[in-house]
Amino acid sequence: MVDLLYLQLRQQAEEMRDQFFQRALALQVDKKGHVPIGIAVLEPSENSFAAYWVRIFISAQGRSVRTINKGTGFKYPVGAFSFVKQPLKGLVRAYETELATLRQLASENRALRKSLLAHHGKVTREISQASFRSLAEVPEGRCE
């Protein structure tokens, strides 16, 4: 159940990435230039994902992206988006608020998963090490 919820969070981040890019393109339709920022959703390992902002550069060699440093916590600092102009900046801030919530929920989910796995291991060890006697072997006077 915990892993299913985590998968849903990752899928939501991917949907937000795609939706953001489409909305950003719509804002740029009458303007010269390109969308200078995007959302990247990566899966560094089987049980994790990361949603972060990237700066997009266009050069003679083609397109390149650079990760924007978030620092600690779940939210990007306001100054991280100083290169983005309005009205795109407003869209970025709105999406960042939602992405920060997703990052926090994902982190809490992984912490809960880790705790549940540790508890499962502990209970499994204790059950396998315990020497339970059959209730039939308990003397009558000891049953309460």
Region locations from a protein language model:
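Conserved glycine(s) in the ABC-transporter nucleotide-binding domain "signature"
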Residues: 1-144
